[in-house]
Amino acid sequence: MPKILDEINQPNDIKKISAKKYTQLAAEIRRFLIANVSKTGGHLASNLGVVELTMALHLFLDFPEDKLVWDVGHQAYVHKLLTGRKNDFKTLRQYEGMSGFPKRKESDCDAFDTGHSSTSLSVAVGLVKARELSEEQRKVVAVIGDGALSGGMAFEALNNAGRLKENMIIVLNDNNMSISENVGGMSNYLGKARTNYRYMDFKGGLETALKKIPKVGDAIVTTLKQSKDSLKHLFIPGMLFEDMGMTYIGPIDGHNINQMLTALKSASRVNGAVLIHTVTKKGKGYEPAEKEPSKYHGVEPFDIKTGKKLKINSEVSYTEVFGKKLIELAKVRNDVVAITAAMPDGTGLTAFGDVFPNRFFDVGIAEEHAVTFAAGLAAAGFKPVVAVYSTFLQRAYDQILHDVCVGKLPVVFALDRAGIVGNDGETHQGMFDLSYLSHMPGLTVIAPKNSWEFERMLEYCIDFDGPIAIRYPKNTAYLGLEDHKKEIIYGKGELIASEEEIALIAIGSMVETAVLVREHLHKLGLKATLVNARFISPLDEEMLHQLTKSHTLFVTMEENVKRGGFGEEVSVFLCEHDYQGIKHLNISIPNMFVEHGDRTLLKEKLGLDAESIVDKICRQRGMQK
């Protein structure tokens, strides 16, 4: 039987498909997504939930003239499929392959590069204003999930969107999930609206009945519609969106293409911003994903029949070590509380929330609030631990500096996914945190070399009287160097092996690489000292002074961009103390955005692997391997 999906090879091809075949096409799209993502990995549940919604948008819009902005963008697979990128799915999130997020350079049907949450509405308002200034006619639609709507930036955009005089359509994809289940007032508000279909039915029936009243029926309906105290305010508390100046349509079934098209066409005739509230099911069409949508949000290659990963990793990750250790510490200290921004699973805090439900706080996608909320807890005598991906902590820079560091409050920042993350690409690499944290006055920044040291550092963080950040990679916890268990002392590194000539000074995850580098150098007849820096801020200047006495080459290693990183700080130290006889190799990430690909492969491409580092050292020493 010929596949309908085979007929869609270019943008707008879906408009050639008969409406009678929409259901079959939706089923084919789901099978295609499951088959391909099971091989490459990627975001599955969110994309399965927006199949019909995306089809309706593509039937309504003309690409690339019209502009469709996806919030976060991980749910844009169906959009990519319908815009001629079907054959690229075999390279999804692979090195030099198709991105898992919208990319303007990938297709002119992608209106904006996204990756972080709650940005779409601001982008759409900008596109609408640009359309107005350019006197163009294109449609502008933003798709945002109910989870992303909990972000403060989304509210800032809504505040401005309500003042628009020209048409802009916001599609609220309400599946009651971000990655994990949503929390907070907005989630509760949408829950009430979601279950209030009776209001829509009652309103429609009442309107019909009133219009049948001779002579005055139409006038009564008009008066009710114009009144701010009309029936909608009795049945839907607040009508938040309309009170902000927008027209609200919904809630409607996001899996019903005809309903979606009717709503979109109606919305396009309104001057100003219109919000279409759609209700969808995350993971729809694949039973394991429907039952456990958070588990299938982001997946590694898996067996379709069982839903289980193809590769079972028995090794423990840093995230797992963190979650287990924090529970242990919280059992000893009643002042320890944990905070996450909609990532309890990803940051390893789900079990903590089960054990200590009253001391666990999921604030939704609101990193700025999470940090200042933690500051408030710290000011009142608690020990808050903010667990967050490195890339997302960027969003709370001012709160860290102004609300935590100025007051020297004892907040712990646990930075997961620090360094090269891999397949999610440039918007998710955690390669900037050392640069934007290490210059903050009073903020201590540390990184562990292995699992044992990670646990000791977490203990140190809980006891530390001041703001402190600990960074660790998306990786299995390193178990090497298990005999090196020197006590953690403020501002002091750890000397692992002492020789002469070359000093290998590594931070966190790069200590494991430095061990391999040293082994290679020995085979080449080169001596090398190995230092586990431990502290990025403050710098262990005493150890650096000592190393200058017997070494002619410093090799610093870090998973962070060169500018503002650990290596640059060491360079400044050497310059300020006029150590002209010391050469310095700064092994770090170039000042560039690193795209998607396997973590190990990306490290090789960036010259962060042991072999590449040895090559650089040999060239610096004027010798060949």
From Swiss-Prot:
EC number: 2.2.1.7
Presence of keyword Magnesium: yes
UniProt-annotated binding residues for thiamine diphosphate: 74, 115-117, 147-148, 175, 286, 367
Assembly: Homodimer.
Keywords, ordered alphabetically: Isoprene biosynthesis, Magnesium, Metal-binding, Thiamine biosynthesis, Thiamine pyrophosphate, Transferase
Keyword DNA-binding in annotation: no
Lineage, opening ranks: Bacteria, Bacillati, Bacillota, Clostridia, Lachnospirales
Note describing how the cofactor binds: Binds 1 Mg(2+) ion per subunit.
Similarity comment text for this entry: Belongs to the transketolase family. DXPS subfamily.
SUPFAM superfamilies: Thiamin diphosphate-binding fold (THDP-binding), TK C-terminal domain-like
Gene3D superfamilies, per the entry: 3.40.50.920, 3.40.50.970
Pfam families to which the protein is assigned, alphabetical: DXP_synthase_N, Transket_pyr, Transketolase_C
Cited function: Catalyzes the acyloin condensation reaction between C atoms 2 and 3 of pyruvate and glyceraldehyde 3-phosphate to yield 1-deoxy-D-xylulose-5-phosphate (DXP).
Name under which the protein is recorded: 1-deoxy-D-xylulose-5-phosphate synthase
Enzyme kind, highest EC tier: transferase
Binding site for Mg(2+): 146, 175
PANTHER family: 1-D-DEOXYXYLULOSE 5-PHOSPHATE SYNTHASE-RELATED, 1-DEOXY-D-XYLULOSE-5-PHOSPHATE SYNTHASE, CHLOROPLASTIC
Cross-referenced PROSITE patterns: TRANSKETOLASE_2
Cofactor: Mg(2+); thiamine diphosphate
GO annotation, biological process: 1-deoxy-D-xylulose 5-phosphate biosynthetic process; isopentenyl diphosphate biosynthetic process, methylerythritol 4-phosphate pathway; terpenoid biosynthetic process; thiamine biosynthetic process
Molecular functions per Gene Ontology: 1-deoxy-D-xylulose-5-phosphate synthase activity; magnesium ion binding; thiamine pyrophosphate binding
Annotated source species: Lachnoclostridium phytofermentans (strain ATCC 700394 / DSM 18823 / ISDg) (Clostridium phytofermentans)
Annotated pathway: Metabolic intermediate biosynthesis; 1-deoxy-D-xylulose 5-phosphate biosynthesis; 1-deoxy-D-xylulose 5-phosphate from D-glyceraldehyde 3-phosphate and pyruvate: step 1/1
